[in-house]
């Protein structure tokens, strides 16, 4: 395969979507992009914090990777960014090898993802047994749940281990540090998320159908923030724990990694690559079913590769297609990759304008 053939194989979906594009569709995409940006803001920060990183790592990823995945990807409506599926993997890499080697592992997975798409391996992902995918993702879900019990109970733990039994042991040893205010606030937020989900289902087909477009997590976030502020509750916030959010994007940074530890990154890199490929293509297939379209899996993998290679050198973390934000994009009227690009620009505006308030 020469470079001309490779160039012909690299064709973003955006180019096809521009045919017949008009002002009406543009306004729909802008509205959807802003909506998804609002939804993505707390999710991006939460995934970064749960992964053992600072909240801005999630924001930078949603901005840079989100823009690149939409602009270069093979799906009309897929939204890219940090994902919950990566939490356990990223946390383990940071704990064992350090942040510099996470950057290296993410960049290497980006190269592998691009090569998978370039050599047309995207179509092979569908042959992975469903049982393997379900077992793998359910295992990740259990570890994510355990890792968040610390914050749910407000435990005073400096750092959580990455392994299953280590997490259980640490939680048990620190149960005496439970913060009652944090526990009650967590339970109230969980109840609100579940209750809002039921309400949104009943609201479909009525004049209150807008409720189904607003995720319960956003409602719970606003509720918890207001309660904490009004009652001055003794709980940690982003500002108290991390010192706020930078009001600008970071410049290019080459990490000082150790080759002695980097040689152990093969399995974490392969895990990031496979998980990112499965998650993004699964999300794209779900989106196809909702809009009656067909994505290009190989182009999508190449876009994921570019995003994951570039983003870590600008303070980001691994990225992939995200189901919740993609579904929100579709329900909000997004029809082309323009909405995903607007979502990224919306988050950029938040960083530039509202970050000093964090």
What is the role of each PLM region?
Residues 1-358:
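Transmembrane helical cores of multi-pass ion-transport proteins
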